[in-house]
Amino acid sequence: MSIVDPQQLYYRIHGPEILPKDTYPVVLLHGLMGFAANWGKIWPDLHARRPVLVLDQRGHGKSPKPKTGYTPTDYAKDLKGLVELLGWTRCHLVGHSMGGRVALRFCSLYPELAASLTLEDSGADARPERVLWIQELLASVPTPFSNREEAKRWFTDNFKNDPITGGFLHANLETRGDGKLDWRFHAPGMIETVETGRATDAMREFASLKIPTLLVRGGTSKEFPAKEAKHMADCRKGVFLVTIDGAGHYVHAEKAQEFTKALALFLEKVEHRTI
């Protein structure tokens, strides 16, 4: 297991410096190959009442990129260190896709720190086929690109049938010192993340939690099938399922207003102890 100093993690906190009574901070965890700015449409509508933390998780964005150590537990331990550094006693966990697996592991390992869990298009079933998909995807992109125009043209031409994914990947390019564009994440770490996070079933871990949980599913998502979502919603008390029509896997980006509304309502109910 590799150790990342929480002080070296790139993060931003939006909202009040003094925590209002009977509220908890919100932690937004991006998905695989994502970064903190992915939540740019969400935190502005949440931070008026409570602090909202966004961060680049290990191997992503501006945070440290160890050669190995990309299990859900590695990510969760990083977050625990950061939460303790900030002096927070409890927080709401919100995770998209891979970030959902991290949030789930955090709640499982440190239940005393978790006020609630929200999984955005993030299921508990094993998906070992995603390992090969990620390997082939990363191998297919001819990084580094000479300039941003070349990169944009390549993603436009090769993701005509999936412009949302193409745009997401294009946003994950950064300019290197030599002027060329390359991934802002550690590619081998992304493969290890999928190998350790999606190749195994996490249903028992999810069912063992005892905190209020919101499942947000994109109505057209293939990543989080309706049958799997219903199975998770029915496995224990305190699990609530919201399906947002017209959204795919990136619910918070495709239907930001609807996603934020569902999340904010859930957080209010948790803090008012009405669920």
Label every model-predicted segment.
Residues 12-62:
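Conserved HGGG/HGGXW glycine-rich cap/lid loop of the alpha/beta-hydrolase fold
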Residues 56, 92, 115-118:
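Residue in the alpha/beta-hydrolase core beta-strand immediately N-terminal to the catalytic nucleophile
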Residues 76-91:
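Conserved acidic catalytic loop of the alpha/beta-hydrolase fold
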